[in-house]
Amino acid sequence: MGMTRRNFLKSSSAAVAAAGVAGYAGAADSAKAKDEVIARTKFIDIHAHCTEDPLPPCNIAGVQPLPLPDELISWYDKFGVEKGVVLSLCNPENFVGGMATETILRICEQHSDRLIPSVGIDPRCLGNHVVNNKFGYIFKWYRDKGCKVCGEVCANLHFLDPKMQNLFKGCEEAGLPLTFHVAANEGWRYGIIDEPGLPELEICLQRFPKLRFFGHSQSFWCEIGTYKTWDERKGYPSGKIDVEGRIPQLMRKYPNLYCDISAGSGNRALLRDLDYAGKFLTEFQDRVMFGIDICAPFEKYISRQHETLRKLFKEGYISETVFRKVARENQIRELGLA
């Protein structure tokens, strides 16, 4: 029997409907598969802080700075973080009393399944000057005690200050990576000083090719794109990234520059332009690392990198491979955690 127009339309509609159902099923399967990847991928936090005892209220936000170890771990349980690197805050620009490496080692020994120690040395200690580098053996000593990173380096000195150069040299000799915080300018709270465009950092990347620099802070992440004002340099530039900045340029040129996406600075650098974030993370997938930087035990002060990375993966901006590398695999490789 010949095909009538009515039968043709009916069969065509059925075919279209079937294709649509198959398409929705495929999308659902894909979404379910991504949810399963997210559920089984535990983050490793490259940038954490905590303290044994409560510290005086911070004069910036007026709140208690730094969580206690159990508070930090409770946030990890909530966010799906397996473990984190506890960074020292030994520079006097940070907090009253600082944070000795011995304290970090003690905390991490008590929570060895969740917390990883770092070493913090102020570049101004030990009579350090241009011809007297005493840091190499110290970093090696702490390395052998289990410290995996040097930092967070927040001294308000220029990258090219001789004291800072000796610190970099000693860290490189010990084979430890270094987490640094860039300041907007001299006297602006804390952080290493550099000019817009990070010219001093570039010289250090050249001078210390075996030292892995883990970059962080507002004045670092603002360089993912371009900006015009000092307020943007010390804050959080917003909007689409139409012209790339110095960070991607430096990363293409120097394989020893890495990115730590912690704090509001790293998270907002990704959220301001999801399309560019996907391209950036994909291009530099082996040198970008998840971090949170919980600096106060209150939820409203905690950035949401875990949500951002999951969003980028679920919505197709990054692949599963990129997601897993940034979430944990790069940290495992660079810190020798396997």
Report each predicted region and the residues it spans.
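Mid-to-C-terminal alpha-helical segments outside catalytic/metal-binding sites
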Residues: G2-I46, L55-K83, Q285-M289, C295-A338
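Histidine-centered catalytic micro-motifs
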Residues: F43-D53, T179-A183
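Active-site neighborhood of phospho(di)ester-bond hydrolases with catalytic His/Asp-centered motifs
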Residues: I44-I46, V86-S88, S118-G120, G151, ...
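Active-site environment of divalent metal-dependent phosphoester hydrolases
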Residues: T51-P54, N91-N94, R124-L126, L157-F159, ...
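Short aromatic-enriched loop/helix-cap "lid" or pocket-rim segments at secondary-structure transitions
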Residues: L55-C58, G97-G98, V130, M164, ...
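A general structural detector for well-ordered alpha-helical segments in enzyme core domains, enriched
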Residues: L68-W75, A100-I107, K134-W141, K163, ...
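Active-site gating/metal-coordination segments in enzymes
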Residues: E82-K83, N94-P196
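Catalytic pocket-lining loop regions of alpha/beta-barrel enzymes
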Residues: V149, M164-F290
